[in-house]
UniProtKB/Swiss-Prot annotation:
Its main location: membrane. CDD domains: MFS_YajR_like (cd17472). This is Uncharacterized transporter bbp_411. It is a multi-pass membrane protein. One of its GO terms (molecular function) is transmembrane transporter activity. Belongs to the major facilitator superfamily. The keyword Cell membrane applies.
Amino acid sequence: MSFDEIKTHNKKAIIGIFMIFSLRVFGMFMIVPVLSTYGMCLKNSNIFLVGVAIGIYGIFQIIFQIPYGWLSDKYGQKLIINIGLLCFLLGNIIAWSSNSIWGIILGRGLQGSGAISSVCMTLLSELVLPHNRIKIMGLLGVSFGISFFLAVILSPIIVNMFGFYCLFLINSLLSIFCLFFGMFYIPASLLNKNVVCNFRSEISNFFKILSNRVLCQINLSVFLIHFFLMCNFIIIPVELKKIFEFFEYVPEIIYIVILLVSFLIVLFCICFIQSKVLYSNITITTSAFLFVLCYGIFLLFGHNNISLILGLQIFFIAFIFLETILPALVNKFSSKNYKSTTMAIYSTSQFLGSSMGGIIGGILFSYLNYFEVLFFEFVVSILWFITSILYLIK
């Protein structure tokens, strides 16, 4: 992809979307690593309320993704993006000015209510030519990864130097920068929006999107990969610490190396494989097979450190690959007048997968051992692979 292929006004909008994504991700992930520790020191706090403060963001994201997507289809993306950013800013200000866990919960809830990721991804897809969409999504994934790593590394340092509440002050300032990009970099509208709508027809069209076979497969895929991710984050770190118990920081280094290698391999794939191959249904089937292979390696070779690292490498290659191409597939198969709504359903499936993976993974690991949880994931991945093959046959 050559950046020269993109029109000047589109370049400005793309930069704006990238900045909004990166700054919001950086701000969000600065809070998560330290909230479980420092949240217990807040007024009226307990373990349950700290858990609520962590989880309420995702719950509100699930609730507001589809309404934001539908509204942006009717009233334009710029207005809805800026409303979401205002909610994010207000949430940060409330959390910063509060001295109790209840203020943090309210602030995190308002942050989550600014659920604009699907709207931004839809706009980004509209700004570039079809053959460049997967590549631009890949670059967005890289910026997401960089923001994530910087946030996780810097947040403990900032808290130790300036205190816990400083994170919300920084988040508030980042939110103001996001609003600047939202107001002055995002175009007013790319399409003529028809704000007059019939409620019954809107409900009918919504259920048509839900029942679309291609979109169902895509939504199932994003649900499952995030389900697997959260399950793995519950059980794999424990196993890594057992294997490398005498080597401090080795698990963290392994994760960093694996993610970097995965990003490079995926970038190579999206840059050199033809778009018609990437856009074909075989990509989901191939990725599903990689998940089956990954869990097969985990189960067959047991506690071997090499097999664990190899399995994780395959897992993250498949995960990042699908995370990169699925939004472009959603845009390809969605109706012109319901692109943001369709993307919102996709994002809701994503957050539901993360939530269910964390909950079910935690319950399973409470009653089952490491290999039994992996076997459960292995069976689910096989069923997914079979359904993707059946879809190809049909």
